[in-house]
Amino acid sequence: MRYIFLPLTVIICMIFNFCTGISQKRTLQLYSYIYSNNLHIHQDILSKFSEMATKVKTKLVKKEKKEELNNDLETKLESVKTKKAVKKTPKSLTQTKLDFATPTASPTKWAKIPPLDPKEDVDEAYKKIAELREKSNVYIGAHVSASGGPEYSVPNAYNILGQSFALFLKNQRTWNWKALSKSAIEKFKSNMSSHNYDPKFVLPHASYLINMANPDPDKRNRAFDNFLDDIQRCEQLGIKLYNFHPGSTCGLCEKKEGIKHISDCINKALEMTKGVTIVLENAAGQKNVIGSKFDDLKQIIANVEDKSRVGVCLDTCHLFAAGYDIRTTEQFDQVMKDFDSVVGLKYLRAVHLNDSKSDLGSGLDRHENIGKGKLSEETFRFIVNSPYFKNIPIILETPVTEGNEGVYKQEVKLMYSLLD
């Protein structure tokens, strides 16, 4: 009987192969199954055919969806890799025509440095600014991106004509970080040399998460580990300065206790590192925040054992927001005299150059672009010509928003144009 249905079996298997698209091997397996089990009645054959076809089609649909999903993922991954390749593999790290993200003054906003103006020769423009820097001993730059690694911060700084620069040494908004690679360290140093940057005019900024004034020992220890890691990165890269915000008591302890916690952490970090000066940044006067008054900075420094490795960075926006009026030459000079008498000019290691959106004494940390806030362009004229700010990094942290992506280069040029 089986021989009677042999032609029908073959025809059904051929149709099965054509309709489902399964391999010839599986088709032959089906044929063998029908033949060996002596399925005499065509209803049995068709029933088995239908059952197996349904299972195979289900598997094929799942397979097709899986392949489609994999293709989509591969396409997306390829797109990401392509973008990373553009950023991480320029023709040469020493070339200046790079386009990376650069931070704004706000910790929640970022913007991109635009492609360089093709009409402007960057090397020639940088040379002109460098000549002004040599004559004046004024080192103005900005906080630039280190996206992809610290080695990329150097050409980014060069692109905006910066004579100094700041950067984050790792992701400033996470507690998780990777160690610096040997390659990144070597490339950073190589770029510093090829672009003629002196490490003493590089001012890394600490993570926004660090708060060593916190009375909670677990949180303070976690902050210290982040703090220490940054300083050790400075050691690896050959950077001499490290800037951080003193911190906040969070309303959980007296200011005196918070100051002691900060000083203790600084002392511990100095014992564990070499060659890096820890720079305290003055605060804007926010509630519970330490460092808005010169006396706060004085007390922290007083408790530091190795005073040769501690300093201060004065932020012009923070000064104004904290109640120090610097809008006229006379007022600015008086503020600097007060700083000298309370803290000491010998501790002044850096400046953050920012206008203020907020009023005098507002206690609000709101940076604005130069000459567009409560401080006039004239204010910055006598600031950059001040004898107090010679031979130290002067860093712009003004807002970079959509539509003014080239603001850092413009402001660097503006500041140097204000020199006498």
Language-model features and meaning:
Residues 157, 205, 234, 278, ...:
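Conserved, mostly hydrophobic/aromatic
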Residues 151-159, 181-197, 228-233, 265-269, ...:
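Short amphipathic alpha-helices and their capping/turn segments at secondary-structure boundaries
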Residues 143-147, 170-172, 207-209, 247-249, ...:
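Active-site beta-loop-alpha junctions enriched in small/polar residues
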Residues 176-184, 214-226, 253-261, 288-296, ...:
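Alpha-helix N-cap and loop-to-helix initiation/capping positions
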